[in-house]
Amino acid sequence: GFVFITNFQDHCKREDLRDVSLTLKLAGETVRFPQEGTVTVAKNANIILPFNMDLDGILLKSATLQPLARITSEGKKHYFFFAPEGMKPEYIFAENTVKGGTKKLIPVPGFNSTVRLKSITGEEILITTLTREQALAACKVTVEKEEKLLITSADVLQEDAKVRIQSTDTILKVVAFPAVRFITETSAKISKKKYCSEISFIKKGVHIFPEVHMASERRFLVHLPEGAFRDVSDLILSIDYIGDTGAAFINGEMVADNF
């Protein structure tokens, strides 16, 4: 199951809720968040905490971490969680489901947090704990029938069996789980680690200089030079103006407006 926690309310003063603990009285057992002590629920937080969650044969009794994604790659299941702001992260497992009797795991969130666990039936899983900021930048994709989790501030586009990443920055960084084996972009620099790859691309900036003509007091004409879309996928026109409304037209057809 899942516990939903929110510390947000419109039109009200919000503040961190400190020294919080939650106890669930279930049929035949009691589950506490956290197992010992207390946590802080940050203001504006919306949190989902799991209990009695089956991780492919390993029973996660409780966690002060929010589930994010599960990918399957090379036949292995890889689970991703992230740490809500203000909460000390912990995983509590049912000892009789984990080989070696691991009961409690206190991770340090980040790209190097991946751990390997094996169930008593021999099934092996990976668990990675991310920060909230990293989770917000995560995107699940499929490449050559293998699932991957990409973490990047850029736009990620799934195009059939390929993935395209685009950004307005000249330096683009991506962290990929699991570690990648092949990238078609020759300018990529790859730092391969045990469970992930850190990939960076450096591209030359593209500079477009449009011609702008003032047709009237409230109307401007913008002409793009020939070849403006060479080496780019999109051009973004940003206009600062003072007024109630604005509208943009291409060949007489309105393509954007602003109120």
Model-identified regions with their sequence ranges:
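Non-catalytic C-terminal accessory domains or segments of carbohydrate-active enzymes
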Residues: G1-F259
